[in-house]
Curated annotation (Swiss-Prot):
It comes from Homo sapiens. Probably functions as a 3'-phosphoadenylyl sulfate:adenosine 3',5'-bisphosphate antiporter at the Golgi membranes. Mediates the transport from the cytosol into the lumen of the Golgi of 3'-phosphoadenylyl sulfate/adenosine 3'-phospho 5'-phosphosulfate (PAPS), a universal sulfuryl donor for sulfation events that take place in that compartment. It is a multi-pass membrane protein. This is Adenosine 3'-phospho 5'-phosphosulfate transporter 1. Keywords: Antiport, Golgi apparatus, Leukodystrophy, Membrane, Phosphoprotein, Transmembrane, Transmembrane helix, Transport. Its main location: Golgi.
Length: 432
């Protein structure tokens, strides 16, 4: 059935949702008003790969292919379905974070400045470009309003392709431990990661960027819930306290902020639902990646595996919808968009490398502080560049959120000093 007829059916079932914030109003027939419909179509495209793949995995396992299989396909099936048991001689232990005796305090300070600058520049640029791409028009003139880029899935694909290339080159050029995880297990983290990224980009059509940043900061709560369900973790009292403070701060910001121009209760609700979807999918991704690290792979190998399936899912879904060519044509019509999308992908991939290097050199606590400050700077930068307003109560709510995040870092450090096992920091393998 033609996509326009599907649009008519869904419009009859759901109220029309206009683009929120400062974005131009979309025409009635535009699918940007039907985010739920696009989500279902995308998910169906991913299922067309996941379901046959799952059935094949179950078939090979029931057939005991590891014992009976032979031929040219055996190594491929073994790697994808069963994995490889790492041998002691094959393991390449990742170097622990140690401070060399000859390293001077000045050199350490310069390295910290390099890491902090790299993270801030990468992710602040990424945030500014993300808001520009999803909320502004391209090709606008005095007589024409231009056109907006609306396909969030195409943007996810561009990010993942460059990240896959960077991870692949890192695996080839740098010595890695022998890979032991079955490849199919990456597909679950990849699916949730693609869906979380899609929700993140799509939400910017309905809510402001500062609201999105605070929503990301509040994902500590669903991460803890997912940790209980997926990893059976237990948490300290201070973690529940800081999670409550974050909830209070976010509530202060959301309840005190006035509506953006052209927004409505329907668009705001759509944005909040998409942000909730982002947080839920991202929380699952983090906990699934933590479980996968039991196979002793490196962070770069994890990055490669997740992005490989992300590219497979998004390319397949875009081809099924006929949207891959349209996204490419949009890039051809608007060179500015092509430059923005490329720079967005570069910032994402470089940010990943800075994450790995910073944690390796200074630990997760320093990394968390840098990224917390980055979120605060991102809100300030967005308000300056795109004219978002924040009330006094909203500003206090933002302060409460970031104070709670820094309190979590301090509490983790105290636990480490006392020799207690601190709750691991959220997996940083895929941030965007």
């Amino acid at each position: 059935m033609d996509a326009r007829w599907w649009a008519v059916v869904v419009l009859a079932a759901f109220p029309s949702l206009g683009a929120g914030g400062e974005t131009p109003e979309a025409p009635p027939e535009s699918w940007t008003q039907l985010w739920f419909f696009r989500f279902v179509v995308n998910a169906a495209g991913y299922a067309s790969f996941m379901v046959p793949g799952y059935l094949l995995v179950q078939y090979f396992r029931r057939k005991n292919y590891l014992e009976t299989g032979r031929g040219l396909c055996f190594p491929l099936v073994k790697a994808c379905v069963f994995g490889n048991e790492p041998k002691a001689s094959d393991e390449v232990p990742l170097a622990p974070r140690t401070e060399a005796a000859e390293t001077t305090p000045m050199w350490q300070a310069l390295k910290l400045l390099f890491c902090a600058t790299g993270l801030q520049v990468s992710y602040l640029t990424w945030g500014v470009l993300q808001e520009r791409v999803m909320t502004r028009s391209y090709g606008a003139t005095a007589t024409s309003p231009g056109e907006r880029f609306t396909d969030s899935q195409f943007l996810v694909l561009m990010n993942r392709v460059l990240a896959l290339i960077v991870a692949g080159l890192s695996c080839v050029l740098c010595k890695q431990p022998r890979h032991g995880a079955p490849m199919y297990r990456y597909s679950f983290a990849s699916l949730s990661n693609v869906l979380s990224s899609w929700c993140q980009y799509e939400a910017l059509k309905f809510v402001s960027f500062p609201t999105q940043v605070l929503a990301k900061a509040s994902k500590v709560i669903p991460v803890m819930l997912m940790g209980k369900l997926v990893s059976r973790r237990s948490y300290e009292h201070w973690e529940y306290l800081t999670a409550t403070l974050i909830s209070i701060g976010v509530s202060m910001f959301l309840l005190s902020s006035g509506p953006e121009p052209r927004s409505s209760p329907a668009t705001t609700l759509s944005g909040l639902i998409l942000l909730a979807g982002y947080i839920a999918f991202d929380s699952f991704t983090s906990n699934w990646q933590d479980a996968l690290f039991a196979y002793k792979m490196s962070s770069v190998q994890m990055m490669f595996g997740v992005n490989f399936f992300s590219c497979l899912f998004t390319v397949g879904s875009l081809l099924e919808q006929g949207a891959l060519l349209e996204g490419t044509r949009f890039m051809g019509r608007h060179s500015e968009f092509a430059a923005h999308a490329l720079l967005l992908s570069i910032c994402s991939a470089c940010g990943q490398l800075f994450i790995f290097y910073t944690i390796g050199q200074f630990g997760a606590a320093v990394f968390t502080i840098i990224m917390t400050l980055r979120q605060a700077f991102a809100i300030l930068l967005s308000c300056l560049l795109y004219g978002h307003t924040v009330t006094v109560v909203g500003g206090l709510g933002v302060a409460v959120v970031f104070a709670a995040l820094l309190l979590r870092v301090y509490a983790r450090g105290r636990l480490k000093q006392r020799g207690k096992k601190a709750v691991p920091v959220e997996s940083p393998v895929q941030k965007v």
